Each structure stands twice: as C-alpha cells, then as structure tokens.
Amino acid sequence: RRQRQMCIRDSFLGVQSVYPNVAMEVMYTNSWFDIDKEGAAAEALIANGSVIIGQHADSTGAPAATQKQKDAGKICYSVGYNIDMLETAPTAALTSATNVWEVYYEYLFKSMMDGENPATNWSEGYNEGAVAITDLGPEVAEGTAEKVAEVEAALKDGSLHVFDTSKFTVNGETVTTAPIDLTFYDYSTGTPVAVYQGDTEEAITDGYFSESTLRSAPYFSLRIDGITEDADPVA
C-alpha cells in the first residue's frame, strides 16, 4: 500500500489546489489488477457522493464503472492509471497518470552499451519526461489544457513542489520534520522483514517534503487531513 498511499496524497493535494474544501474517500482492493473489485469500489464511492474516481490499479474496472454510472445520470468522472482510458470511458475519462518507460529503457540500454552499471536506485519525473498524463477527455473544463501546461512547467523548473508543507496538515498541525527510515522491508509474508538496512534521514527541506530523492521507492506516508481511508478492503 505504501506506493498507493503516496499517490493518493499527491492526487488529493492536486485537486485541493483547485477546490480547497475537497474531501477524499479511499477504498483498497489489495490487488494491482482486479476488474470486478475496482468496478465495485468505483460504484460504492460514487454512491457515497464521490464525483471524481481516481485509481492506482491497472485495470479498466473503475473507469468502466464510472462511465456506466455517468450514462445513468450520475455526475462522475474518472482519472485513470498507466494508459489512456478514453476508449473505456469516452465521456467520463478526464486523463490518466502514466509512466513513460522508454526514458528509463533508453538510459538502461545506453548505460550497458557504454560499459557502465545502471543505477539500482533510479527515479525521474517531468523534467526528464519520465512521467506524463494522457490526452484530456472531452468534458474537461475550459482552460484545463492551459493550466496543465502551466503546472507542468512549474514542476519542471522547480517553482512548484507537490508536497509543500504549507499546503497540508496532519491532525490539524503543520508538519516541520519527517525522519524517514530508508531501510527496505519485504512485506510479502505479512510480517515486515528488513532486506536492506538504511539510514534515517530528514525528508523535509526548505518547506517541502522531498519525495523520491532519498530513494526511488515512495516514502511519503503522512496521513494528511482531508482523506478518509476505509479500514476494510473491497470484498
């Protein structure tokens, strides 16, 4: 769940930058790919009043369910993951977050051809073109493309930090310190087992939480205010 938790929080902060009073409800499927559970989660969230259904799982279950609910008269939209969801949700899809894998593969192959060992801890972003969003859907608000371009430019030049600590609170308080244990744990057995012993380092510098700079694996796990996580996974 750790990677998903980080993506939940940055999605929330992105929406909150436009709609300050937004609230987010989170349901877990405990799977990277389960069409039925993802669809059921989307339907349950929409029934609870959610208007935008985001996902950090790989199937088309959530976008398809969102489109079905929208066709039935609900006001609801989808933000997908990894691939363009417009074929699945032609009017409900707003966009998808996606990884641009050719950037990494080009780096990997070039390193090998040059006789160099590729980095084992690699994480890049907008500046290198390693992440992006897919085409915008037909029902995005007027001016969205221009705003997206503005935000992407700010991410690239470093003037915008997603995890600016002035933009969120934890239990009503501004966070000023966040020591991160960089030990790598294997959670596959249900009991965490340390497979690499790392140092503990401070993640907050210059007023923002510096995600994915101390290591490539996500480590932003602060439970920020405004997000409710359902305790039980989707059945």
Feature locations, PLM:
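Short, small-residue-biased leader/transition segments that mark boundaries at the very start
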Residues: 3-8
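Structural motif
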Residues: 30-44
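Periplasmic-binding protein-like
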Residues: 48-59, 77-81
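Segments of small-molecule ligand-sensing domains
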Residues: 115-235
